[in-house]
Amino acid sequence: MNRRELIKNIAIISGGLFIGSNFLLSSCKRDDAGSLVLSEDLMNLLAEISETIIPETDTVGAKSVKAAAFIALVFQDIYSEEEQNDFIAALNLVNDKAKEVAGDDFIKLSAEKRVEVFNKVKDPKNKGFLAMYQMILFAYLTSEKGMQASFRY
């Protein structure tokens, strides 16, 4: 199975899971008093995690479509404070595991080490991790370049 087929299948399978109440209720008014903003360090980490999941090959990667910037908007505007905290905890978990396994921050590791770390930390039962993974796929697949690279139309 090539990368294009894999991304397409993942999108189809997780599509139903991904469209949750947050997106259905995103038009509802929300008090932003408790809204968090991703720091520059967390944005950089998210960009590198995104590129690890969807790397640039003969097609564009997640960094090229600015998946992290899109995710930051959704994070700030749609996620509840609890979901934001879960998401940040998942980002920190990846970085902490990188320090444990490879002795350095995730963003400083080689692509091969990043994949190794990511495979050790991924846990679909972790709400924050699942949200992060799904948002990366969603951001990529809803971008023009990501859609053109992944689907034939």
Say what each PLM segment does.
Residues 38-44, 61-62, 123-128:
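Structural motif
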Residues 48, 66-153:
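Mature-region segments of soluble proteins
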Residues 7-26, 110:
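N-terminal export signals
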Residues 28, 62-69:
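Short alpha-helical hairpin
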Residues 1, 5, 21-56:
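C-terminal segment of N-terminal export signals and the immediately downstream linker at the start
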Residues 53, 57-65:
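Long, well-ordered alpha/beta core segments of mature domains
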